[in-house]
Amino acid sequence: MEALEKKLKVCEPDAYKLIVIDGVYSMLGDLAKLPEICDLCDKYGASVMIDDAHGLGVFGENGSGTASHFGLTDKVDLIMGTVSKSCGSLGGFIAGDHDVLNFIKHTSRSLIFSASMTPAATAAASKALDIMIEEPERREHLWDTTRYAWKCFRENGFDINLTESPIIPLMVRDTIKALSLVEEAYRKGVFITPVIAPAVPEKDVLIRFALMATHNRSHVDQAVEVLTKIFKEYGIIA
């Protein structure tokens, strides 16, 4: 927050200032400090835009995202997201003030030179949103499984950093080990993904363990058992 405030302080008071953040950070699974950021926006006359690719369907009322989770939807100027993750489709969206969206439609190069979503992708995304609203038990189940997974990994000595979401980083901090153990885990029935440089600094290489609403505690038990043995073999955990 200190670094952000320093930048805001040197901006011209009347200049337009837009703070662009992730709602949920895709590597470590932690959340943006949205309340503090919104306070700075009020203080310095800035606007805020959230890329909520990993918040939609998981956080907030009816899975409506990070801003809703913090009760700050009215404080956020633009919310951008994708329907390729929790919605299982293709495409994306941006929500905000009508005049701002009209401006984006006519000036955003990436939008101007892209094609519309196909009818099938649109229907799939629409149905997924209906399910999020009508079947909250799916999200409740996801969170039960997520909290259980946090507990299991920590009890077995894994470093899962500061995750606050179903994205669970398993810190490895070694590229060769990360790539090797991913292959070994796959052979033993556990699908995980490596995150290596340049996506993260070399010292922060990790394995991303991501949960879905269709996973349950028995899946977590199986995965933790397999990964604990492999991580011990590679000397990552004691």
Functional labels for PLM-detected ranges:
Residues 1, 13, 17-21, 60, ...:
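Pyridoxal 5′-phosphate
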Residues 1-50:
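Active-site phosphate-binding strand-loop segment of PLP-dependent enzymes
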Residues 44-47, 54, 59-164:
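Active-site C-terminal subdomain of aminotransferase-like
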Residues 140-149, 154-189, 199-204, 211-213:
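Conserved PLP-binding catalytic core of the aspartate aminotransferase-like
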